[in-house]
């Protein structure tokens, strides 16, 4: 999955960018205060994308 597609999915579910690290972006779900880091790669493994969504407590993206 492309990183931009995952970020679009995260933003559509109400999460926001908390901060930028050197190699990761950190997102927060304001509904439940869950946090997750998203690596800065062009392609993100589908398993990792599902894991990030699970950490943020949002539905998994469609493949």
What label would you give each PLM region?
Residues 1-18, 48-55, 61:
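Charge-dense, helix-prone N-terminal extensions
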Residues 7, 11, 15-35, 39-41:
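Basic/aromatic recognition patch in beta-strand/loop cores that engages polyanionic ligands
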Residues 30-36, 40-63:
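C-terminal structural segments of small proteins and small subunits
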């Amino acid at each position: 999955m492309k990183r931009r597609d995952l970020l679009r999915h995260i933003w559509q579910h109400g999460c926001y960018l908390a901060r930028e690290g050197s190699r990761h972006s950190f997102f927060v779900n304001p509904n439940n205060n869950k946090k997750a880091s998203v690596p800065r790669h062009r392609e993100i493994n589908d398993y990792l994308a599902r894991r990030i969504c699970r950490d943020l407590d949002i539905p998994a993206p469609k493949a």
